[in-house]
Amino acid sequence: MRLETLPSEFQEALPVLEKIKAAGFEAYFVGGSVRDALLQRPIHDVDIASSSYPEETKRIFDRTVDVGIEHGTVLVLENNREYEVTTFRTEDVYVDYRRPSKVSFVRSLEEDLKRRDFTINALALDENGQLIDLFQGLDDLENRILRAVGTPAERFNEDALRIMRGFRFQATLNFDLEQDTLSAMTDCAPLLEKISVERIFIEFDKLLLAPFWRKGLEALLTSGAIEFLPDLKGSRAKLEQLFELDSDFCFSASEQAWAALLLALKTQEVQRFLRIWKTSREFAKRVADIVEIVTIRSERDLTKRDCYDYDIDLLLQAEELRQAQGLAVDFSAIHNLDASLTIHSKQEMVVNGGMLMRDFGFEPGPKLGQILKELEYAIVDGHLPNDLEAIYAYIKEKK
């Protein structure tokens, strides 16, 4: 098969391929960019595979950076763009289900492609638009099938994260897992416990944010692989409640997706759960805030103080979750409450602790903090204007 017209992303990278070929080596576009071009999806990163060894690649180009030279990857700077050029390679035994004990550089494209995860990612494209398909990846693309390259169990034993990538590709592409591939993913799922939490989080997060997240999540649950993810053993029945969200609902942000997951789990230990997943403190706080907002909304309407205490984007994300649950929502009320706030942070108050110590003799300590918090919420609730004269009169009355 031949592409009559190369996508612009490939056309811009053609000088890289042409220089490598002019030096006497082979070079091809490979991987996800080729797959996405055939599916007419947006192309993000253009990856190039070459028969030139790293030092040979560096001699071809004026500007390069060693970004992963031990694995054969050189970053080539060409026409104000960056391209990763990776030498054809084979990999030895994987020592920890994550990393090969040894990477060997080879001159054979076939040897390079057969170590890849799925057939749809094992396609190569030359400078003339000619596709190289050694593992029937084109057929699988046409039939919307995810099939491991070669023997499925070998691929997942090499790198167990490929199991999560399989579920993520389902969620992203709306493809079906080929039966032998799914069986191997199920059998190899215990190996996920060998993978770093951070790598699993990235794949799970991409799955949840994908347009067909239900498909990927359902396969993750029914395969039993969910049992081997951090702190999710025995969670299948609870997580299946996510399928009760509106059928066309997609998560708008990572924190919203993880909040929905935690709400389904009905856990009271949101922060502990996210520490296990090794997320940032900021991310964990935003997820916890959405969980709190949804809980508040199940009991009462939001107030001005709620709109002050929580970021408006989190309030809106929580309301979206309610809407997906078929509950009554009021987005305009959130915007109106936010617009009615006199201040949006304590930094906007016309007084601070230093002024109160100077003008009223307050000492540093809990009492000063208490009066500042009282002033802050009096302003937020609309009981006190954010005006110096009014605030000082309020303090004098309280004293």
From Swiss-Prot:
Name of the gene encoding the protein in the UniProt record: cca
Pfam families linked to this entry: PolyA_pol, PolyA_pol_RNAbd, tRNA_NucTran2_2
Family: Belongs to the tRNA nucleotidyltransferase/poly(A) polymerase family. Bacterial CCA-adding enzyme type 3 subfamily.
InterPro entries: Bact_CCA-adding_enz_type3_sf (IPR050264), CCA-adding_enz_C (IPR032810), CCA-adding_enz_firmicutes (IPR023068), NT_sf (IPR043519), PolA_pol_head_dom (IPR002646), PolyA_RNA-bd (IPR032828)
Membrane-spanning ranges: none
Source organism (scientific name): Streptococcus gordonii (strain Challis / ATCC 35105 / BCRC 15272 / CH1 / DL1 / V288)
Coiled-coil regions, chain positions: none
HAMAP family, per the entry: CCA_bact_type3
EC nos: 2.7.7.72
BP terms from Gene Ontology: RNA repair; tRNA 3'-terminal CCA addition
A GO molecular function held by the record: ATP binding
Function field: Catalyzes the addition and repair of the essential 3'-terminal CCA sequence in tRNAs without using a nucleic acid template. Adds these three nucleotides in the order of C, C, and A to the tRNA nucleotide-73, using CTP and ATP as substrates and producing inorganic pyrophosphate. tRNA 3'-terminal CCA addition is required both for tRNA processing and repair. Also involved in tRNA surveillance by mediating tandem CCA addition to generate a CCACCA at the 3' terminus of unstable tRNAs. While stable tRNAs receive only 3'-terminal CCA, unstable tRNAs are marked with CCACCA and rapidly degraded.
Cofactor: Mg(2+)
Binding site for Mg(2+): D45, D47
Comment field (misc): A single active site specifically recognizes both ATP and CTP and is responsible for their addition.
Catalytic activity: a tRNA precursor + 2 CTP + ATP = a tRNA with a 3' CCA end + 3 diphosphate; a tRNA with a 3' CCA end + 2 CTP + ATP = a tRNA with a 3' CCACCA end + 3 diphosphate
Keywords: ATP-binding, Magnesium, Metal-binding, Nucleotide-binding, Nucleotidyltransferase, RNA repair, RNA-binding, Transferase, tRNA processing
Gene3D superfamilies: 1.10.110.30, 1.10.246.80, 1.20.58.560, Beta Polymerase, domain 2 (3.30.460.10)
Subunit (UniProt): Homodimer.
Name of this chain's protein: CCA-adding enzyme
Enzyme class: transferase
